[in-house]
Each structure stands twice: as structure tokens, then as C-alpha cells.
A protein has these predicted regions:
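Loop-rich non-cytosolic ectodomains and luminal regions
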Residues: 4-250
Length: 250
């Protein structure tokens, strides 16, 4: 219950609070420390909706967090869930949109000829992931070049949907997204980890895209949010648009 006798009054002094704890430090299952899993968010929102229904009260849900993982087109399970949740009863959902516009973590383009994205990787990066999102109907030839000039072509139709490459002293784990009934975007996910030592190769990494067959030709590259990488790591020619953190893209 908000304090009614305080000198300062907020926008809704008569409001009651439902506080739902999400995420635990040291969570198992690969979740970032302290950051909730998608399932925990779904359960927390569901609990708040049910509680508001039991009390016959309007509900405002505040989700003051987010990350850069996703296609940013509103098609993910979490984004669609929040869209549907906002239509239940008298419900308003407020989601933080982050502050990633100047963090150099996003690059986008429309491929009509050979395109490239140059990524600066700073010193002492223990690992780094890159998301490439495109339309499933588009077929690109994708090449990755290391700072030392070693180059590899990324196969996008391999059986099993995952494989490993090595460029210099960096191992690249490649995961190919599968079609989903509710999404037309395909994800190609790259995880860079050191082969020896503690850090991946620093310098300029180049991603080259060559169109083979295009329908939309649009592509989007995302890095982890700024607090998940060094200040000197980012795209040289970044795209500040569509840098809202997920799930504010719902």
C-alpha cells in the first residue's frame, strides 16, 4: 500500500502493489545471473493478471528490464504473450525500452549487392555473440573474416542446424534457426569463444553478405546489450533505429 500521509504524492497514491520476484542470482539453466527466464516472466505476468481478476481491480504491470536478443518484430513468444495479456480486463503494460541507440550494437541494411558489416572487437572480450536475422525466403552467401585475414563461409543449410568453425584463436559456434508457425524471420546465431587463453581475437571482424535469391533483402545484426560487452566493442557503422530492447517491441 502506498503511503498516503507523505509530503509528496505520486500519480496513484491509492494504488496497491503486487511485487513479483523474477530471476535468482546463480540461476541454473544458462540464464544470465539475476536475469529472469522467459518462462518466469510469463508466470509472473499470469499471476498478476489472475490476482487482479480475483480482486476485480484494474492492473498496471511494470517490466523495467530487457535485452537485445530477438528479431525485434514483435513475433516472439514473449512479445505475443504481452500483446494478448494487455487485452485482458483493464490492463496496461509498461516496458522499459533501454538506452541502446548509441551503444553501436545494431547494424541493418537492405541487400541489393554485396554488403558488409565491420565489427570492432575490443581487448579482453571473453566471448561475444552475434545475431543475424533475415527473412526465411531470402538466401544469402555469408562470409566471416577475422582480424588477421582468415575467412570462412557460413553454411546455412547444414543438417542438424549447428556446426563449429575456427578462425585464428577464436572458435565460432554457428546455430541456424528453424521455421516457426508464427514467425517469418530466420536467425543465424554466432557464439565466439577463445580456443586457447581467456579472450577472443581483438580487432576488426568483417561479415560479408552476398545475395543469391532475395524476397525482401532486409537483414539485421544485433550484439548483446551494452552492459554485456566492452565499450570498444561494436559496429563501425551502426544503425541506431530499432534498438529498443525486447520485450518493449511487443
Amino acid at each position: 500500500m502506498c503511503i498516503r500521509d507523505s509530503l509528496y504524492t505520486g500519480a496513484a497514491p491509492e494504488a496497491e502493489l503486487i511485487v513479483v520476484k523474477l530471476g535468482l542470482p546463480g540461476n541454473s539453466g544458462g540464464a544470465e545471473e539475476g536475469f529472469p527466464r522467459t518462462t518466469e516472466i510469463l508466470r509472473g505476468v499470469t499471476y498478476a493478471l489472475r490476482k487482479a481478476g480475483q480482486l476485480n481491480m484494474p492492473l498496471v504491470i511494470n517490466l523495467s528490464f530487457g535485452n537485445s536478443y530477438g528479431s525485434h518484430d514483435g513475433s516472439s513468444l514473449l512479445e505475443r504473450f504481452l500483446d494478448n495479456a494487455s487485452e485482458i480486463g483493464k490492463t496496461v503494460i509498461c516496458v522499459g525500452s533501454g538506452n541502446e541507440g548509441a551503444a553501436r550494437g545494431h547494424f541493418a541494411g537492405n541487400i541489393t549487392r554485396d554488403s558488409r558489416a565491420e565489427l570492432a572487437v575490443g581487448n579482453y572480450e571473453k566471448s561475444l555473440n552475434i545475431q543475424l536475422w533475415k527473412n526465411y525466403s531470402d538466401v544469402f552467401r555469408i562470409r566471416l573474416q577475422s582480424p588477421g585475414g582468415e575467412e570462412a563461409e557460413l553454411t546455412t543449410n547444414i543438417q542438424g542446424g549447428k556446426y563449429t568453425l575456427r578462425l585464428e584463436q577464436t572458435r565460432i559456434l554457428v546455430y541456424l534457426g528453424e521455421p516457426l508457425p508464427y514467425a517469418v524471420a530466420q536467425e543465424i546465431y554466432l557464439e565466439m569463444i577463445p580456443v586457447t587463453g581467456s579472450y577472443i581475437n581483438a580487432g576488426i571482424w568483417t561479415i560479408r553478405l552476398e545475395p543469391i535469391m532475395t524476397v525482401t533483402g532486409q537483414y539485421y545484426l544485433y550484439l548483446p546489450a551494452g552492459n554485456g560487452r566492452g565499450d570498444s566493442t561494436g559496429f563501425y557503422r551502426s544503425t541506431p533505429k530499432v534498438t529498443l530492447t525486447v520485450p518493449s517491441t511487443a
